[in-house]
Amino acid sequence: MAANKDKAGAAGAGDSMPASASAPSQDALAVPIYWAEAKRELMQRDRIMNKLIPQFGDLHLRGQPDPFTTLARSIVGQQVTPKAADLAWGKLLAVCPKLAPNQVIKLGAVQLSGCGLSKRKTEYILDLADHFKARRVHADLWSEMDDEAVIAELVRIRGITRWTAEMFLIFNLLRPNVLPLDDPGLIQGISQNYFSGEPVSRSDAREVAANWEPWRTVATWYLWRSLDPIAPPA
């Protein structure tokens, strides 16, 4: 699923932010403040990155500014093709253009299911909306919390896996040092670029990624790009 990440992925850009949520501290659509430094350091210390990064010029990670929408979009995209996820997401936005927790709860299970969502995904999105509405998540504090603390809070929500939480760290909070080891695109990118296409274990991936710290998000993004150079991953 990593190979279509900025394109449709973690969220739909441009949706308004619910009152219970907060945006990243910087403009999510601007160049992340650490990007230039990260590129420079990665190119200095990693021969693969030194060849890979220049191929993509000024392209960079584009964040998704609305926490609720980011997470809802990730749930919609779980275990389906990008095309099916885009279709269901489009139907959801058609019936709920201002995607916010209160509006989703008002829609209810029947209308959500009518957008092509499975019973389980419908339950997950309603539970997510309820968490935001009841303020059982601390979206206004996430920008100040460390990565593992944010992950620990998010995975308590039904339908949010560690991978989903890591995508949230990358695309909403723009954290610079996330290594999503459960992401097939990352593993495939390491395999193709560092191991000539040979199978790669998690321990292999960790060993390669140790050289990227504290910029593992940036290196991961460039490996996604190496697999899908036209559309940014989401």
PLM regions: where:
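C-terminal accessory module of base-excision DNA glycosylases/AP lyases that mediates lesion recognition
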Residues: M1-L59, E123, S143, D147-E148, ...
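Alpha-helical ds-nucleic-acid-binding substructure associated with the helix-hairpin-helix region
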Residues: L29, I48, L52, V80-T81, ...
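Amphipathic alpha-helical segments that form the core helices of the histone-fold
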Residues: L71-R73, L112, A209
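Buried hydrophobic packing segments
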Residues: A72, I125-L128, I190
